[in-house]
Swiss-Prot record:
Family: Belongs to the universal ribosomal protein uS7 family.
Molecular function terms from GO: rRNA binding
Keyword Ribosomal protein: yes
Organism, as annotated: Helicosporidium sp. subsp. Simulium jonesii (Green alga)
InterPro entries: Ribosomal_uS7, Ribosomal_uS7_dom, Ribosomal_uS7_dom_sf
Any one GO CC term of the record: ribosome
Superkingdom per UniProt: Eukaryota
Functional summary from the UniProt entry: One of the primary rRNA binding proteins, it binds directly to 16S rRNA where it nucleates assembly of the head domain of the 30S subunit.
Coiled-coil regions, chain positions: none
Keywords in alphabetical order: Plastid, Ribonucleoprotein, Ribosomal protein, RNA-binding, rRNA-binding
Quaternary state and interactors: Part of the 30S ribosomal subunit.
GO aspect biological process, one term: translation
Protein name: Small ribosomal subunit protein uS7c
SUPFAM superfamilies noted in UniProt: Ribosomal protein S7 (SSF47973)
Length: 153
């Protein structure tokens, strides 16, 4: 813990919107300083354990967990006598897909209970940057649901 505080990465030096989005999703029920501290501790943990740039691993993690372009939504088609349920495929914007990837990474880190959250967040970011982990499994589950919906159209 002492090494993490001594070698603290200052998030203010990185003017990246991805970090701001991570802080925004971590801030629920907390103060902003706690969310910034949690993210900086997890980035320091990444820098100490894998000896790579933590910002680039964060970007790779989000890139690997971004879901596909399409989303299945039900829509109603009404004729003269009948109402039919029809599946529509809607394209998501890149911003929404990035938000979904960040939510999946944070959700996968919060599901683990044995250690502190910054360690779980760091490990999940590293796993997602290696294209494995729970966040990538969430993405694969969503892709499988989309394929099943396309088959049943």
């Amino acid at each position: 813990m002492k090494n993490l505080i001594k070698n603290k990465i200052k998030l203010s030096t990185y003017n990246i919107t991805l970090i701001e989005h991570f802080i925004r999703f971590l801030i629920k029920g907390w103060k902003k300083k706690k969310a910034i501290n949690l993210l900086s501790l997890s980035l320091n943990y990444i820098a100490l354990t894998i000896n790579k740039d933590p910002i680039s691993t964060l970007e790779m993690a989000v890139r690997y967990t971004i879901p596909v372009y399409l989303e299945v939504t039900p829509s109603i088609i009404t004729n003269e006598n009948k109402t039919l349920w029809h599946k529509r495929f809607i394209c998501k914007s890149s911003k929404v897909r990035t938000f979904q990837a960040i939510k999946w990474i944070i959700k996968a880190a919060k599901e683990k209970k044995d250690k502190s959250l910054y360690i779980h967040l760091a490990k999940e970011i590293v796993d997602a940057s290696r294209n494995s982990g729970k966040a990538v499994k969430y993405k694969e589950q969503m892709e499988n649901k989309l394929k099943l919906a396309q088959l049943h159209m």
